[in-house]
Amino acid sequence: MWQQLMVTVDEDLAEDVSDALMDAGALSVSFLDAGDQPLFEPPPGTTPVWAQTRVVGLFEEGGDLAAIRSALGGRFGDERLRDWSEEALADQVWERTWLEHFRPMRFGSRLWVCPTGFTVEDTDAVVMSLDPGLAFGTGTHPTTALCLEWLDAADLQGASVLDYGCGSGILGIAAALLGAAGVHAVDIDPQALAATVENARKNRVGDRIEVASPGGLADFDSDIALANILANPLMELADALRSRVRPGGRIVLSGILAEQADAVASVYARKGFEMEPAVFREGWVRLAGVRRT
């Protein structure tokens, strides 16, 4: 068993409370959004905090959480520490726990993402085997799902594909399974590149997927460029992504909040893309367009 101690603080106090919990014997401390404030693009090298941050400390069973609460109240002032709560956590076999929540998922008419230990009965299905790991991307997030559905509906036979910000490699691997002749998977995170290589091998498309950091990307033109990252990087990368799409080729963008869609679409329209109507889901957006100039 474990114990979890949680408290809500203003953002300027979050780091200090985190340090105090660690000093009090916490095994780990994490931050959660205590309100409803999206925070998707913290500066590199910083820990994301919110205007109202929920600080969560994990302790071994038997710790005196009441004494810790009292000590923090005396140090920071009870009025600055709000909504205290405690919770007992049972030991879990985490592999079994995620399997209870991560089931085969279908995207479009034929593409499935299936974790280890499950099968898909549909004989016409295109099945990707993928388990949760270190890198982002299992298909559960709306932005990933929107991109997978686009791929399922596209004609990818013989296509050259760029997966920029590949994470787990899910989009590039899906493209290869759906018929793409070659995929360039790019990410700034070495763990993401390693995950992509392993997942591509597991799905027997490793010979069609090349991984690289942005600086090591080979010179090529793609028929389709996919970028499921965030709005600000997408706008900053517009020239770089355009240069990787052949005239007449297509671009697919996601990781964009609904209120950011017009700004991102305008940037790419100015770069010579004919943008299609946005597709919305749960506050997120997928944009797609064709390079005309």
UniProtKB/Swiss-Prot annotation:
One of its GO terms (molecular function) is protein-lysine N-methyltransferase activity. It comes from the Bacteria. GO terms for cellular component: cytosol. It is found in: Cytoplasm. Its main location: cytoplasm. Its EC number is 2.1.1.-. SUPFAM superfamilies: S-adenosyl-L-methionine-dependent methyltransferases. InterPro entries: Ribosomal_L11_MeTrfase_PrmA, Ribosomal_PrmA_MeTrfase, SAM-dependent_MTases_sf. S-adenosyl-L-methionine binds at residues 144, 165, 187, 228. The keyword Methyltransferase applies. It catalyses: L-lysyl-[protein] + 3 S-adenosyl-L-methionine = N(6),N(6),N(6)-trimethyl-L-lysyl-[protein] + 3 S-adenosyl-L-homocysteine + 3 H(+). Pfam families: PrmA. One of its GO terms (biological process) is methylation. Keywords: Cytoplasm, Methyltransferase, S-adenosyl-L-methionine, Transferase. The keyword Methyltransferase applies. Belongs to the methyltransferase superfamily. PrmA family. PANTHER family: ELECTRON TRANSFER FLAVOPROTEIN BETA SUBUNIT LYSINE METHYLTRANSFERASE. NCBIfam families: prmA (TIGR00406). Methylates ribosomal protein L11. This is Ribosomal protein L11 methyltransferase. It comes from Methylococcus capsulatus (strain ATCC 33009 / NCIMB 11132 / Bath). The gene is prmA.
